[in-house]
């Protein structure tokens, strides 16, 4: 595959054979259908990775769609738009970003890019936060997307004009964050929700949690490990964020207690001051926690790495229901069962967010412009019921309702088949499987390697020169 470097942009140029393959999904009939159709106005709520994906697909030259994106903050990028602010901005809203200083990706750059727009080959396999944000900036500039975004604007309400009508239009009410008393309402043919899945922290109601006199925070408010120098800190939760925060704190804290209820982790923490406690928390006291095995651990601080909750404050509960972190009723986790004009591109966990959200947006676009081949409502309801049954039988409920991992590839193929576009490359799946295995075996060091794919569809991990990169940098977490 060839590439062209132009003013810092990497534009992927596909071979003719690949182009021909792509064109079989884009027939002359579909082009003419969208070109002749009346203009449709689509609201996009949020401009993180998913919102940028939506804007790119909605602005295809083959069609008459006018997108309007609403972004609460002053910049696009969501998580990747770093801010040192930990709690609230000047208008009382939480920051869009949960990223901390010096952060790196925990996925290779091949899984952190949009189709057809690659990262600079000079970057390490696991880039820094600043590299990722610069990539998003180049992409938005190259695709000329910023002109569609209303910054510092919050959506307060989205209601169907004709409740129960699958093709209803929507009334979207919004206001400037600086003056919520003055609002405006516009009508849209469709709404695509991209408000993120790492915005609203989940803090379990442990008995006695309000009695703790030390520092208690969620990982979303965590910024610098240096703040905990010489302290005894409990990190609650052992998913990506829990293990990473424990690793970073180990450079500064006296002792780090990694408490969780999962299987013992395989990672070896090099500093020797990370103490794993795979027991649940029975009680939190003024200066300690009591584990389920009865052991009491005295602490200065607690960092809750306990995930996030889904929330859609601009929708009524009769439109979107959230029960035990299961967002319903959605077909394929993206299309509302009752409204073919309402989409959610923000739910999936443990996926390659960039390419997956891009193809979710392509699917939404195909439904909006009428090129998608959708099942009947009854068939979609049956599909939802089958998946609920399967996930219930396989212990994938609660925070796992929208969890994908290796399921994401078949999921993407189904969307591509219905939307009549090309599914994601097999190469991405190879990268995914490799990094998942590498990360599990060596969580503290895997980011120090560069990945090189050879002609046999296998990947070689090559250790980077330690003098090329700063040591002990944290990396991006998929939650």
Residue spans of the language-model regions?
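Glycine-rich active-site loop/strand segments that organize a redox cofactor
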Residues: 72-138, 331-337, 382-401, 405
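Glycine-rich FAD pyrophosphate-binding loop
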Residues: 59-86, 257-264
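C-terminal, flexible cofactor-proximal segment of oxidoreductases
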Residues: 341-479
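N-terminal Rossmann-like FAD-binding beta1-loop-alpha1 element of flavoenzymes
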Residues: 39-68, 245-246
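Glycine-rich dinucleotide-binding loop and its adjacent helix/turn
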Residues: 122, 128-135, 141, 184, ...
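A Rossmann-like FAD-binding core segment of flavoenzymes
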Residues: 153, 157, 165, 169, ...
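Feature captures the FAD/FMN-dependent oxidoreductase FAD-binding
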Residues: 118, 122-190, 195, 199
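Short hydrophobic core segments
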Residues: 45, 186-198, 234-236, 299-307
């Amino acid at each position: 595959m060839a590439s062209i470097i132009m003013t810092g942009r990497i534009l992927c140029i596909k071979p003719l054979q690949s182009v021909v393959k792509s064109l079989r999904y884009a027939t002359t009939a579909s082009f003419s259908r969208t070109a002749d159709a009346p203009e449709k106005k689509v609201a996009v709520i949020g401009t993180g990775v998913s919102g940028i994906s939506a804007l790119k697909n909605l602005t295809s030259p083959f069609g008459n769609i006018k997108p309007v994106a609403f972004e609460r903050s002053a910049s696009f990028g969501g998580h990747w738009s770093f801010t040192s602010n930990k709690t609230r901005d000047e208008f009382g809203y939480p920051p869009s970003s949960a990223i901390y200083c010096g952060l790196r990706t925990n996925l290779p750059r091949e899984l952190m890019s949009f189709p057809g727009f690659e990262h600079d080959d000079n970057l390490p396999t696991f880039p820094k936060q600043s590299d990722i944000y610069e990539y998003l900036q180049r992409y938005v500039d190259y695709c000329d997307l910023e002109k569609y975004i209303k910054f510092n604007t919050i959506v307060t309400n989205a209601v169907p004009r004709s409740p129960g009508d699958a093709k209803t239009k929507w009334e979207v009410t919004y206001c400037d964050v600086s003056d919520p008393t003055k609002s405006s309402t516009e009508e849209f043919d469709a709404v695509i929700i991209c408000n993120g899945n790492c915005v609203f922290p989940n803090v379990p109601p442990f008995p006695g949690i309000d009695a703790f006199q030390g520092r208690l925070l969620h990982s979303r408010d965590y910024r610098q490990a240096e703040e905990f120098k010489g302290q005894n800190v409990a990190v609650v939760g052992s998913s990506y964020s829990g293990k990473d925060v424990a690793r970073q704190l180990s450079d500064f804290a006296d002792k780090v207690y990694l408490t969780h209820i999962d299987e013992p982790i395989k990672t070896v923490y090099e500093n020797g001051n990370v103490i794993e406690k795979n027991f649940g928390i029975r009680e939190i006291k003024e200066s300690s926690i009591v584990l389920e095995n009865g052991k009491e651990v005295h602490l200065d601080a607690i960092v809750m790495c306990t995930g996030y909750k889904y929330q859609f404050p601009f929708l009524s509960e009769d439109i979107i229901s959230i029960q035990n972190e299961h967002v319903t009723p959605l077909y394929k986790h993206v299309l509302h069962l009752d409204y073919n004009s309402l989409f959610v591109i923000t739910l999936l966990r443990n996926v390659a967010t960039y390419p997956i959200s891009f193809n979710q947006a392509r699917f939404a676009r195909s439904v909006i412009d009428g090129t998608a081949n959708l099942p009947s409502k009854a068939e979609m309801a049956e599909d939802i019921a089958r998946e609920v049954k399967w996930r219930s039988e396989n212990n994938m409920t609660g925070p796992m309702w929208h969890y994908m991992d290796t399921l994401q590839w078949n999921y993407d193929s189904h969307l591509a088949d219905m939307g009549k576009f090309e599914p994601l490359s097999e190469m991405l799946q190879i990268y995914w499987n490799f990094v998942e295995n590498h990360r599990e075996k060596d969580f503290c060091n895997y980011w120090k390697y560069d990945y090189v794919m050879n002609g046999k569809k296998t990947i070689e991990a090559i250790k980077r020169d330690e003098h090329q990169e700063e040591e002990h940098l944290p990396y991006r977490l998929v939650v």
